[in-house]
Amino acid sequence: MSKVLFIKASPLPNEVSRSSQVAATFIDEYKAKNPSDTVEELVLYNTEVPLLDLELMTAGRELQAGKAFTDLAPDVQKRLNAYNALTEQFLAADKYVFVFPLWNLGIPPLLKAYVDTFVIAGKSFRYTEHGPEALLKGKKAILIHGSGGIYSAGPTSSFTHGEPYLRTILQFIGIDVVPSIFVEGIDHNPSKEAEIVAAAKAVAHESAAEF
């Protein structure tokens, strides 16, 4: 039995977000094919995702130096507890499904803040004399990515730092990232929205059966 963490990184409701609609198709098919697996949904825009800032970095250094957790300020304790809970939730999963849009050629800022909760030296990778070593080998992820333009291939593919960034950072910590599902080009061809979404859902249906 596998534990799947379904991470939604869009503030838009499902009826507006086409990538979320495709992700719902993927999840429904996955559950049908894997009834004994558990799927936990994490909606980032409904979740406290602490930003890795000076306060948290200072608290981390103080704890490493021997300061007791209870000696930290109450608000810092609360933020660290939220941060650490996200870390442990991510590490406990076997598979990951990310759905996220392309914003200004990158990922949403809250998704980047979330990435910082699990890409941690000593947790998901470690430093060795031969360089960094991934610690999450054997886990699997799929990325479902929405964009108004077409960036998965063609002349604009080198512009994007969305799907390639998330794929790279997950591979860095050892996770096997299977081929992504793209929901793209609707802003270029609004009249083809239904066709584009249907094609992406068909890919999602097939991908879920193999995930």
From Swiss-Prot:
Co-factor: note: Binds 1 FMN per subunit.
Entries under InterPro entries matching the protein: Flavodoxin_fold (IPR003680), Flavoprotein-like_sf (IPR029039), FMN-dep_NADH:Q_OxRdtase_AzoR1 (IPR050104), NADH:quinone_OxRdtase_FMN_depd (IPR023048)
EC number: 1.6.5.-, 1.7.1.17
Catalyzed reactions per annotation: 2 a quinone + NADH + H(+) = 2 a 1,4-benzosemiquinone + NAD(+); N,N-dimethyl-1,4-phenylenediamine + anthranilate + 2 NAD(+) = 2-(4-dimethylaminophenyl)diazenylbenzoate + 2 NADH + 2 H(+)
Signal peptide: none
Cofactor(s) the record lists: FMN
Matches recorded under PANTHER family: FMN-DEPENDENT NADH-AZOREDUCTASE 1 (PTHR43741), FMN-DEPENDENT NADH:QUINONE OXIDOREDUCTASE (PTHR43741:SF7)
Family as reported in the entry's similarity comment: Belongs to the azoreductase type 1 family.
Assembly description: Homodimer.
Role according to the record: Quinone reductase that provides resistance to thiol-specific stress caused by electrophilic quinones.
Annotated protein name in UniProt: FMN-dependent NADH:quinone oxidoreductase 2
